[in-house]
Structure formats: structure tokens, C-alpha cells
Amino acid sequence: MKILVTDDSKMARKMVIKTLNEDIEEDLEIFEAQNGQEALDLYKEILPTIVFLDLTMPIRDGFTALEKIKEFDKNAKVVVISADIQKLSMDRVLKLGAFDFVKKPIDSTKMKQILKKLN
């Protein structure tokens, strides 16, 4: 399974990757991006199974990256990760086509549930 983890914080990316590697008993190919533009470019190159995407990033924020990824591939599975998921943001990402969302700090049980929904 190819997974793209996008966050401007290297520590946040490492936490998501650590959670995935510890809790998922499947072969994972994990790629990293540090902003929304990198995520979009990398998505087009590797066509990951799922994308974990932070909302607040420089260059291209998560909202715009989500929108552009969905324009490129309407079937893309994008999971929004954010410390501050307000109702307004939640409504917006769901309208843009987010597959699911995870609140920071990362809950490994939630991550497992999301990956099970892919099958």
C-alpha cells in the first residue's frame, strides 16, 4: 500500500509514519511531502492508495491541495489531519471530498479504522 503523508512539521510526519508502521500489519510504502504543492506533485507521480494531509501548511494549504488532488483524481482517498478541526473546517473538507479526518494527536485506533475502510 502506498501512503503519502503531508505536513509541514517533520515531527508530525514522523508521528503519523510511526503510528502506521507500528499498527498496520501490511507492507507499506510511505512517501512524505512538506506542503500542499509537494503533495499534489507527488500524488500525480506515485498515485498513492491514501493521503494523510494536514490543513495548515505553507505554499499550498491542505484545503487547496485536497481540492486539486480531487480534481486530478476524483477517487483519491484523502484523510485530513489537523489539531484544530472546527465544524466549519470539517464541513469544508467533506464538501471538497475528504475520505475521513483525524484529529491530532494521532489516534492509532482511528488510523486502523480508516485503513480498514479502504478494503
Annotate each language-model stretch with its function.
Residues 104:
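A Lys-centered signature of the CheY-like receiver
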